[in-house]
Amino acid sequence: MKFTALLIALGFSLQAGQNAAPSSHLVFDDNFPGDILINEVRVPKAGEAMYTYYETLGWRGRAAGYAGIQAHPKAHNYIFSIWDHKGHTAPIRAVHRGPGTLTEKFGGEGTGLKSWNFTLGWEVDTWYTLVSRCWVMGDHTYYGFWSRSGKTGHWTHLVTMDVAAKEAFFEGGTDAFIEDWLETGKNARTSHLRGGWKRQLNGQWYAFGRAQYSVNYWDLDPGKRSFNFKTNWNGGVAKDATGEYYFMIAGGKATQPTTKNPSQHAIKRTATKPGYAPIKIKSAKVKRDGETLVVEWENDPATLPQFSYKIFYDGIKPRVASGMVPSARRVELPIKQLGRATVHLICEDILGNKSKMYTLNLAGGR
């Protein structure tokens, strides 16, 4: 009996660790540095599986990282992470956390800073646009992360991180992947991707027109994490009423490949730049608070999120105030002589579009 039990135990141990859905990747054709990354992701209802990371944006460089959505036991969440690098002069820190966003250090496969958001949520069968932009702040580089729901059309600023390295831009090629982190390969998980863009450092936009699909072949051998689902994967290009998109399927016994590992795929792109509605200032107001001028404003959430602002004070002593602060909606200007004046506000969005000038009048004696 003891010998039989030992054989059973050994058999179980040999099978354990071989039941993960194959990790699958799409690597796009951007082999140059840039400062903005965009990709759209959709998880069809049949492709939703718990313990899955549907990574949508991944990049290399001195601030390598990734972003995407997850089917997590707590909720459908968003994740944005940046790895530590030997060239960093200080730890990565969060300088802005959107509502519901949490940040924490991570370890394991390298170290760095991770952000989670379990409150915003995402739904199956809905396209979500994920955007990350990096910009130089002195000797550091900031990284912002935004999401847009295809259902509501609204944008959300989830997090901004400060990386202590100058000009640490996004290096290509940008990638997306599917990861089953708890060996639930019996469940098929599917990712749809489209509308990928990268802005080059000269300001020109590059559309992701080609991608290489691959599966981690080293995980398919006997004893490896995906051996029991070594033939249950697929990827390529598909089309529905919304147009063409890249797809990846990992896991599920019914899943069978219709392409090679690796294989090349393409979607013809005709647009020359992203087509999202540019930023619009919804409302603004100005008031006098002692010897301080206070300007507050609100942007339309259905238009591209704010990246920076510029305020022109046309009074007795004209002044200009500006900042690359995506979360700023209030600015205070110390002005001793506050007479009758005009205030002009312009915002620039995360893709570089400028809003129409919003003009406010400040009456004398207020």
Regions found by a protein language model. Give the residues of each.
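Secretory/extracellular carbohydrate-interaction modules
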Residues: 17-102, 117
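Beta-strand-rich modules
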Residues: 335-354
